[in-house]
């Protein structure tokens, strides 16, 4: 699973479409969030979109590269969170729905 944040609905939609079209993700969930962070020595607060990207661990490098190339931020949050365990039929579907998983 990969987590990323974007600052606009337009950038969100571009990233989602590209990841799904390229079969780099089986599912992407989005949440409207408020982010609080330090940037260039200043405390900032902005509305963002959180992307929860369901993918396989072995596709992370491709997912990261795709997001990096499409992202509107200079330094994008792109982090992988391991899926330790899960409902087997769901994990099978995730595998079958992504690149080279079929």
Task: Report residues per predicted region.
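Positively charged, small/polar-rich N-terminal and surface patches that mediate targeting and assembly
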Residues: 1-102
């Amino acid at each position: 699973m990969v987590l990323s944040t974007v600052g606009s609905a337009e950038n969100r939609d571009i990233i989602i479409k590209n990841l799904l079209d390229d079969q780099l993700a089986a599912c992407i969930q989005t949440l409207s969030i408020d982010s609080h962070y330090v940037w260039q020595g200043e405390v900032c607060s902005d509305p963002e979109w959180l992307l929860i990207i369901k993918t396989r661990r072995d596709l992370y490098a491709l997912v990261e590269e795709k997001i990096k190339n499409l992202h509107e931020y200079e330094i994008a949050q792109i982090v992988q969170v391991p899926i330790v365990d899960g409902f087997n039929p769901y994990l099978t579907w995730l595998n079958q729905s992504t690149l080279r998983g079929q």
